[in-house]
A protein has these predicted regions:
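Conserved helicase ATPase core of P-loop NTP-dependent helicases/translocases
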Residues: 66, 70, 281-285, 290-333, ...
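Conserved helix-turn-beta segment of the N-terminal RecA-like "Helicase ATP-binding" lobe
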Residues: 53-55, 62-82, 98
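Interdomain linker/hinge connecting the two RecA-like lobes of the SF2 helicase core
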Residues: 18-21, 157-281, 286-287
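Post-DEXD/H (motif II) to motif III coupling segment of the RecA-like Helicase ATP-binding lobe
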Residues: 110-170
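Walker A/P-loop
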Residues: 17-37
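Conserved pre-motif I regulatory segment
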Residues: 1-23
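Conserved segment of the helicase C-terminal RecA-like domain
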Residues: 359-391
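A short beta-strand element within the Helicase C-terminal
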Residues: 98-101, 322-326, 330-347, 352-354, ...
Length: 405
């Protein structure tokens, strides 16, 4: 589906349905389509009753408020009665707005849906616009349940196929966990003192013998990964058996720990890759703030860095060419002329993976680089992330010097 087709689809039905759901990938022009829908509704309302249309736009973060203001100024809006606020302030929304716009609509948690339900009770004729590249099934079902709807759908892969978005070169780099050198440690009885040390093959004997002493088990990368995976599987089975929230939390925490550990093992290869990218404009995705600080030449963008927005502005104005991100820049934040996206971290969330992938598609010749560990959760997430993309875009390489810039 082209941008023009998506726009025509939305505009042709926006006056006829309760909800217009713009389920479109990054770069497909969701914001502009939404503004055009607002204008069409506003024109219709003015012809009907000569009153200006009121609009409430709800966004995930404060920074996106400025994005919307800039887009409205750029494209023009047929009403001045517009309020823009964050999801956390949804309780402050004008209950009698003519149009409610939910940017990044996948943020509609159960609590936020309750607020929307309360608005619909007092304002049943309000028009709804939902914008999101990736909408979970439960939220999509909720959107459909609100009345008549029109879904305008197209993912990033569709946008590339239809030449709406540029075709990226995707380099995947298989890595292997070492199973020879003992470079990691597994700690048992961490709160105990008087530690003893053993190798991986001796672990069960030591665990049985030293129940009141701290045990340090020397192991390889592969053995450490297997230990993490066994722990995840055990917590998962316990949760599936008795549905106890405690085990669910431990299962999810262990799964997060595994992804963090895999990401840490890729720091060296990513350091080598970025040494080849000195002349490129690069976005590096990291797992955590501590990891991002290891890449000293990359300006960090994260929730703890008060200079994050300045770093983003400097990047977009070409004052700097290299930035790293931790749990930011995945949605709604535009990057100017960013050619390379390097993934030091892969996400279990399909929503986050696709949002991050879309950051690179603002450049006419984008490059995506994904190092991953074979036969691990990393490989599963890489395959899941790329499942919709044509194989001709994907180049598996074993030598980073094969990256063509």
């Amino acid at each position: 589906m082209t941008r023009e087709e998506a726009t025509n689809n939305a505009l042709s039905k926006v006056l006829l349905v309760k909800s217009t759901i713009l389920n479109l990938g990054t770069g497909m022009g969701k914001t502009l389509i939404a503004i055009k829908c607002i204008n069409k509704i506003a024109d219709f309302n003015f012809k009907q009753n000569e009153e200006e249309t009121t609009v409430s736009i709800i966004v995930p973060r404060q920074a996106l408020i400025e994005n919307w203001k800039a887009e409205i100024k750029k494209w023009g809006c047929n009403t001045d009665k517009i309020e823009i606020l964050c999801y956390d302030s949804i309780h402050k929304v004008n209950n009698y707005s003519d149009i409610l716009v939910f940017d990044e609509g996948h943020h509609l948690s159960e609590l936020k849906r309750e607020y929307l339900d309360s608005i619909l009770k007092v304002n049943p004729n309000v028009k709804l616009l939902f914008l999101s590249a990736t909408i979970p099934r439960d939220i999509m079902d909720y959107m459909k349940s609100l009345g008549t709807y029109n879904i305008v759908k197209g993912n990033i892969a569709d946008g590339i196929k239809d030449e709406v978005l540029p075709t990226p070169i995707i380099y995947t780099i298989p890595l292997y966990l070492d199973n020879i050198k003992s470079v990691a440690e597994i700690i048992k009885n961490p709160r105990c003192s008087n530690p003893v040390t053993c190798n991986y093959d001796e672990r069960w004997n030591f665990i049985k013998r030293f129940t009141t002493r701290k045990i340090i088990i020397k192991c390889t990368q592969k053995q450490y990964y297997n230990e993490l995976s066994d722990k995840i599987d055990w917590y998962k089975r316990k949760f599936m058996f008795n549905k106890t929230v405690v085990f669910k939390n431990k299962w999810l925490r262990a799964a997060s720990e595994r992804l963090k550990w895999l990401s840490e093992q890729k720091v060296d290869i990513c350091q080598s890759i970025i040494s080849l990218l000195q002349d490129q404009r690069v976005l590096l995705f990291c797992n955590n703030i501590e990891q991002s600080l290891k890449f000293k030449d990359y300006a960090p963008i994260n929730s703890k860095n008060k200079n994050s927005l300045q770093n983003l502005d400097d990047f977009n104005n070409s004052k700097i060419n290299h930035i790293s991100s931790v749990n930011m820049l995945s949605e709604g934040m535009n990057l100017t002329n960013c050619r390379v996206c390097l993934f030091c971290n892969l996400n279990a969330s399909e929503i986050l993976s696709q949002q991050k992938f879309g950051r690179s598609l603002r450049h006419p010749k984008p490059i995506v680089i994904i190092p991953y560990f074979k036969d691990t959760r990393d490989e599963e997430l890489k395959d899941k992330m790329l499942k919709d993309y044509d194989s001709s875009m994907i180049k598996e390489i074993t030598n980073i010097k094969d990256i063509k810039l």
